[in-house]
Each structure stands twice: as structure tokens, then as C-alpha cells.
Design a protein with these regions (language model features):
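Conserved catalytic cores of very large enzyme subunits
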Residues: 2-136, 154-174, 178-481
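Conserved functional hotspot residues or short segments at active or partner-binding sites
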Residues: 144
Length: 481
């Protein structure tokens, strides 16, 4: 029936539109409505003809990998800003009820760039004769190769697109030999991660990762500082090409962060030409997506600080700053190994993880709005004779709320992410199902600084200086201050 409706729509038979709307499922209507909001003025016809759902009934199996292949082959390819990007937001992988999508993930793009799919197939460990994981990995590799072959065979009159298409599928089987290849390989896999419905996936430490390719190109006379900067500018603009589609809530909240600075594995500070290029690019283009996060420490140079401040002053919101020394020490105290935290990253905006060793999920549960506990305590109208008694009441309220948001979750599988995690391949386990070294679960605590400031103000003005009462505080909240 749907094929006949599509044929009639293509023929511009107007009376079919109301009929088509009645035959579309509720889920499809929801997505069409959402997509029209995201895109602006897009016709029902265009969305109905191009929007397609791929229901993955058996995540983590060979059947799922076959569905990936079908979806990859049907999805369109974007050529914009001088690079190929095979992400089609109108081809949607649909998860069964009860499966929680993987979000807020940062792949290790140093492994992605050096990856060889043939070697992965040869070296993957069989753990039993009927190894579901291995079959699924073989299937996902076939899906990736099929997509690369499709790109290779694309007909294009654009000389640059034709040039890039020639990279495929060869770059899937070796390390990159130029900055241009490295950028294209990152974009290829990044697009597939998005196509797999892994929202909020970051780019990681690109100044550390890309510098070796840039240096080689400069030594060979292939690139200059300015030409490399132009390529990285195109890279950033293309990542933001689908911002509306990649934003599950607020426009621009995509989790597409580029991490700069910080120490490398040997403890040396990373400040190179690529670092400077990204800061200069974001100062010039003034876009909110993607974003920069800068890992700072006591060795961060004054010149870098000045560039960061200049970039921030244009209103783009980048870079955010990470006090890496403090965060790494806290991660070790929490349970991460000291030898791993040098490769600290964030899962989206701020939640720490170890790049290449983590499938930590920091946004799967309902968020806790901390100031709500203070509000509930004040509404009860108890007489608090000391600040400590009020603080204890707020803590007790939080202790009641926290267990209410915790639940057991059945996560989606990611054979695609598993390809680039050595622990997954060695264990024979999927990225989100005990394959990675770390998989901590987190609950978002919203408004912690607000709660702290509120409590400090109450202590000062209510209990210490006796200028106002708790009833005054409650009235201020009720009347929007």
C-alpha cells in the first residue's frame, strides 16, 4: 500500500495526501511532525517519500547487522564543504520497546584512523563455536564495506567529490597517509555512528590525533598552515550541517565536541598548530555546533589562554574548560586506573570518561533537579532553629528521591563501536554489554551550584544576619523572585 501511495504522491495527485496521512502509523506521524519542525518548510510529500524506518528487532545479532547494511545502502550521501558525509537523517534505525539507546559516546578516533577492517576480521577472537558477537562483527564490517563501495561508485560531476570517492574503500583497510584522508575517514565513520542512532557522539582529542598527519603533509610540501586550516574549517562546518537533526532537545545540543589541549600519554602538554587552528576557526566562524572543550592545567600557555578568551568573546560558547588535573585525580578516586585517565574525555558536555575504554552512560535516567528538594522542604513549613537542621532535611529529601530515578536498563548494542575497542574484540563482547573496560552509569544532578548558592544565602541572611525568614524565601520562589 505504501509503495502505491508513494507512486501517487510522485505524480502529484493531491487527493492522496489526506489518505496517506490516515495510513501513516502514529510513530511515523510523530517523526514526520518532528522532522518538519527541525527542517522548517518541508513538504509532507518530501518527507513521506524519503522518511524510512528500519526496525531493529534483534539488536546485537547478525540479523541486526544485515539491517544496518540495508539502512546504509538506502541512506543518502551528503557532499558539502568539500567532504563526503554519509549521514541521512530521514533513514531512521528504530529500536524495540524496552531498549535504551546508546548516547553520549566518544569513540577513539586514533583507533578509527589506524583501523584495518580486514585485520580486525582476521584477529577477532572466537570464544565458542556459535559466537554471536563475531557473527555480528562480520556482518557490520560487511555493512560498512557496502557503504564504502556505494560511495566509490557514486556518479558526480564535481571534481573534488570524485577525488574523495577514490579514497573508498581503500582507507578502510589502512592508516591514513594525509590530513585530507584522515578528515574524510573521521567524517565517514562519524556519519555512520549517527546513522546507527548513537546520539551525542563526540570527536575527541583532534589536535593530538591529527597532528601527525599534518606534520607529514607539511614535510612533504602537501599542506601549509593556511591550507590545513581551511580543511579543518570545512570539517567543522560539515559537522554542523545537520545540527537540527542531531539535536534531540535544544537546537545545538548535539554532543559534537572537539577536545583540545591537556597532557598526552607521556605527560607532555598538547599545544600544536592544530590546537591553534581550531581556536582561530571558531573565533572566525562563530558557530555553536560543533563545540570546543579545552583541557587546561598549570602548564597551559598564556598564548593559548589569550586565544581561548578571544574565541569565547565572540559569543559562540567555545571553548568550555576542563580542569584536567582535578578531574583526573577525582576519576582515580572514583575507580578509574591512573594509567588510563591521561586520555580523559567527556561523553557530551561535561561527563568524564576515558576515551577508547569507556561505554559509560551518563544520561540514561531521569534527571534530579536539586533545588526541588529545597523547595519541598520549605513548603512543608517546619520550624528550623539552625541551618544544620535545614541542611539535614534537604539531604534527607534527596536521599528519598535518588532511588526513585534508578532503574534497570536494557541497552542497545553497538557492533560499530565495538570495532574500535580492543577490549571488546579481545573479550568477544559488545561495546555496551561488558565489552569495554569501564561502563559506569550516571544520573544528572541539575542545578547543584544553584542549590549551594541558595543554601549559602539562606545561611547568611536567615540564620546569621536574621534579615529575612524562610517564609520570605518561599514567597520569593512562588512569585518568581
Amino acid at each position: 500500500m505504501n509503495n502505491k501511495i508513494k507512486w501517487l504522491l510522485k505524480k502529484n495527485i493531491s487527493f492522496i495526501k489526506p489518505i496517506a496521512k490516515k495510513l501513516v502509523s502514529k510513530n511515523q506521524k510523530k517523526y514526520i511532525y518532528t522532522w518538519r519542525i527541525m527542517l522548517g518548510k518541508v513538504s509532507f510529500k518530501e518527507l513521506f517519500l524519503n522518511l524510512e524506518f528500519f526496525r531493529d528487532e534483534y539488536p546485537g545479532t547478525f540479523l541486526s547487522a544485515k539491517l544496518y547494511r540495508k539502512m546504509f545502502l538506502k541512506s543518502d550521501v551528503t557532499f558539502a564543504y568539500n567532504y563526503i558525509y554519509p549521514f541521512d537523517p530521514l533513514k531512521i534505525r528504530f529500536l524495540p520497546e524496552g531498549i535504551t539507546a546508546l548516547v553520549s559516546i566518544t569513540p577513539d578516533y586514533s583507533c578509527v584512523l589506524k583501523s584495518d577492517l580486514r585485520r580486525i576480521k582476521q584477529e577477532i577472537t572466537f570464544h565458542n563455536e556459535e559466537d554471536k558477537f563475531v557473527d555480528t562483527v562480520y556482518g557490520i564490517i560487511d555493512a560498512v564495506e557496502a557503504k564504502a563501495d556505494k560511495i566509490k561508485k557514486r556518479q558526480s560531476c564535481n571534481e573534488r567529490e570524485h577525488f574523495l570517492s577514490a579514497f573508498f574503500p581503500e582507507i578502510l583497510y589502512r592508516d591514513c597517509i594525509s590530513l585530507d584522508e584522515a578528515i574524510q575517514k573521521i567524517l565517514f565513520y562519524n556519519a555512520l555512528f549517527w546513522q546507527a542512532r548513537h546520539w551525542h557522539n563526540g570527536l575527541g582529542r583532534l589536535d593530538l590525533i591529527l597532528n601527525q598527519y599534518y606534520i607529514r603533509d607539511v614535510e612533504l610540501g602537501i599542506e601549509t598552515y593556511e591550507s590545513a586550516k581551511r580543511r579543518l574549517k570545512d570539517f567543522c562546518l560539515l559537522l554542523g550541517y545537520h545540527t537540527k537533526f542531531k539535536s534531540p532537545g535544544l537546537i545545538g545540543d548535539t554532543g559534537q565536541y572537539i577536545l583540545l589541549g591537556g597532557i598526552d600519554k607521556e605527560g607532555n602538554n598538547v599545544e600544536n598548530d592544530i590546537t591553534y587552528m581550531f581556536l582561530e576557526i571558531f573565533t572566525e566562524i562563530k558557530v555553536p555546533d560543533p563545540k570546543l572543550i579545552f583541557r587546561v592545567n598549570d602548564k597551559t600557555s598564556t598564548e593559548i589562554w589569550n586565544l581561548c578568551i578571544k574565541c569565547l568573546s565572540n559569543g559562540c560558547g567555545s571553548p568550555l574548560f576542563m580542569n584536567e588535573t582535578l578531574i583526573m585525580n577525582n576519576m582515580v578516586e572514583f575507580g578509574y586506573e591512573r594509567e588510563d585517565v591521561w586520555n580523559l574525555g567527556t561523553s557530551a558536555c561535561w561527563e568524564p570518561l576515558v576515551i577508547g575504554k569507556s561505554s559509560c552512560q551518563n544520561n540514561p535516567f531521569k534527571s534530579i533537579v536539586l533545588c526541588d528538594s529545597l523547595y519541598r522542604v520549605l513548603k512543608k513549613g517546619r520550624d528550623f532553629y539552625s541551618f544544620q537542621s535545614l541542611l539535614l532535611a534537604v539531604k534527607n529529601d534527596l536521599a528519598i528521591e535518588v532511588p526513585l530515578v534508578i532503574e534497570d536498563l536494557n541497552y542497545d548494542y553497538s557492533p560499530l563501536m565495538s570495532l574500535f575497542d580492543s577490549d571488546c574484540l579481545n573479550k568477544g563482547k559488545d561495546f555496551s554489554h561488558k565489552g569495554t573496560k569501564y561502563m559506569y552509569q550516571g544520573v544528572q544532578l541539575l542545578g547543584l551550584p544553584n542549590l549551594v548558592n541558595s543554601l549559602l544565602n539562606i545561611k547568611k541572611y536567615v540564620f546569621d544576619r536574621h534579615l529575612i525568614t524562610l517564609d520570605d524565601c518561599l514567597n520569593a520562589i512562588a512569585n518568581n523572585y
